[in-house]
A protein has these predicted regions:
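Short, conserved catalytic or adaptor-binding loops enriched in Gly and charged residues
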Residues: 1, 77-81, 164-167
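Active-site-adjacent substructure of cysteine-protease-like catalytic cores
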Residues: 91-149
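Noncatalytic regulatory segments and standalone regulatory/sensor domains
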Residues: 5, 136-188
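Active-site-adjacent structural segments surrounding the nucleophilic cysteine of cysteine proteases
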Residues: 1-68, 139
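Catalytic cysteine-centered active-site loop
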Residues: 50-98
Length: 188
């Protein structure tokens, strides 16, 4: 497994949940899932291992929209700002995503829509939600993602694409490589 930091952030945490995102009319608790997803990827790096969403919010708030959380390009910009080269794909065909995943760092962000996903009909959100994955594997004919979910449903741990996600994945941001000057926790 290549998970370097086990910390899981909740966007409603009292330390940052009441912070404005983007304005005082919209709280981080209700709109900060995109920022938390970027944070979950970035804390895997030595440079940001002790950061919290309050630290990441300072940069990410410029990509927040009133009542709609983080813009899609904000996820790309955030991951790039915090040390990753990123490949973004709309999930119109997962085959393209699987090809990129096989050459990736096993980290990224998934945007879920508002339907129930997979054969087990899992509810990830009722309106759209960003969730980080910090590892993945292919096992028994299915792709599995190790997710860190900042939302109240707390979908943390291993989730199967077929059983838990199929039909509800809208976009995927895949961290393909590290930029110069960045390294994973514990690596030389």
């Amino acid at each position: 497994m290549t998970i370097y930091n086990k910390t899981i952030f909740r966007q409603a945490d009292s330390r940052w949940g009441s912070l404005p995102y983007p304005t005082s009319s919209y709280s981080f608790a209700g709109n900060g899932c995109g920022c938390c997803a970027v944070a979950h990827c970035a804390i895997e790096l030595e440079n940001f291992k002790n950061y919290t969403p309050a630290n990441f919010r300072k940069y990410m708030v410029q990509f927040a929209t009133k009542g709609n959380g983080t813009l899609w390009n904000g996820i790309t910009k955030g991951l790039e700002h915090y040390g990753f080269n990123v490949h973004w794909r709309q999930a119109d065909t997962m085959e393209d995503i699987w090809k990129v995943l096989k050459k990736s760092l096993k980290k990224g962000v998934i945007l879920f829509g508002s339907s129930k996903g997979g054969t087990k009909r899992v509810t990830w959100t009722t309106s759209g939600h960003f969730v980080a994955f910090v590892d993945w594997k292919y096992e028994n004919g299915d792709y599995w993602f190790y997710c860190k979910d900042s939302g109240g449903r707390k979908h943390d741990g291993w989730f199967s694409y077929k059983q838990h996600m199929a039909g509800d994945v809208r976009n995927v941001w895949i961290c393909t490589s590290l930029k110069s000057g960045y390294k994973f926790i514990g690596s030389s």
